[in-house]
């Protein structure tokens, strides 16, 4: 059961997820809304396409750090891996469906990666190895990336996380795969 402090943390995590690095950077540097540029997605990939590698890196890092902050603080305050995974889900929902942008946010990959590294760097390293294998097979980033992300629940089981934590990780994967289905 979630107590009131945890509930408030989840709400704060969702709202923190509403901070979209791509939006802030393009407003600050170019006085435009990235949601009206390129693919219209306020994420690292669109930033890279429209403004170049530097903007991709800044956006990726900003959104990844956002996920890592939420996960790290949840771990510090509550110490329960199931709750930490729930906090990661909350920040992802805030990033993907931000209330301040009428539900039109990013696709969550950068935030997920940052949160996952903070959650368990060994799982993150395992998934990097899986990605490299699939990258060598498919010679691209999108398909190997999505296949790798789908391997998270298997890693959760291999690294002995609870069934509830593993199910939450599977829900996160379903969300990310749904948002990235195009």
UniProtKB/Swiss-Prot annotation:
Gene Ontology MF, one: acyl-phosphate glycerol-3-phosphate acyltransferase activity
Main location: membrane
SMART domains for the chain: G3P_acyltransf
Domain of life where this protein originates: Bacteria
Catalytic activity: an acyl phosphate + sn-glycerol 3-phosphate = a 1-acyl-sn-glycero-3-phosphate + phosphate
GO biological process, one term: phospholipid biosynthetic process
Residues spanning the membrane: 5-25, 54-74, 81-101, 117-137, 157-177
Keywords: Cell membrane, Lipid biosynthesis, Lipid metabolism, Membrane, Phospholipid biosynthesis, Phospholipid metabolism, Transferase, Transmembrane, Transmembrane helix
Known role: Catalyzes the transfer of an acyl group from acyl-phosphate (acyl-PO(4)) to glycerol-3-phosphate (G3P) to form lysophosphatidic acid (LPA). This enzyme utilizes acyl-phosphate as fatty acyl donor, but not acyl-CoA or acyl-ACP.
Quaternary data: Probably interacts with PlsX.
Family named by the database record: Belongs to the PlsY family.
HAMAP family: PlsY (MF_01043)
Protein name as catalogued: Glycerol-3-phosphate acyltransferase 1
Protein source organism: Bacillus cereus (strain ATCC 10987 / NRS 248)
Gene symbol of the encoding locus: plsY1
């Amino acid at each position: 059961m979630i107590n009131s402090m945890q509930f408030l943390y989840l709400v704060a995590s969702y709202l923190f997820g509403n901070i979209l690095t791509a939006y802030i950077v393009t407003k600050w540097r170019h006085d435009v809304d990235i949601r009206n540029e390129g693919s219209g997605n306020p994420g690292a990939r669109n930033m890279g396409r429209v403004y170049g590698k530097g903007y991709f890196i800044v956006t990726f890092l900003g959104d990844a750090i956002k996920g890592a902050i939420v996960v790290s603080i949840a771990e510090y305050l509550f110490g329960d891996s199931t709750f930490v995974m729930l906090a990661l889900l909350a920040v992802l929902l805030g990033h993907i469906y931000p209330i301040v942008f009428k539900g039109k946010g990013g696709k969550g990959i950068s935030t997920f990666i940052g949160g996952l590294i903070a959650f368990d760097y060994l799982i993150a390293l395992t998934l990097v190895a899986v990605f490299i294998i699939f990258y060598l097979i498919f010679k691209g980033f999108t398909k190997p990336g999505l296949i790798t992300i789908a391997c998270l629940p298997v890693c959760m089981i291999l690294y002995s996380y609870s069934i509830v934590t593993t199910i939450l990780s599977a829900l996160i994967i379903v969300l990310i795969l749904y948002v990235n289905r195009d």
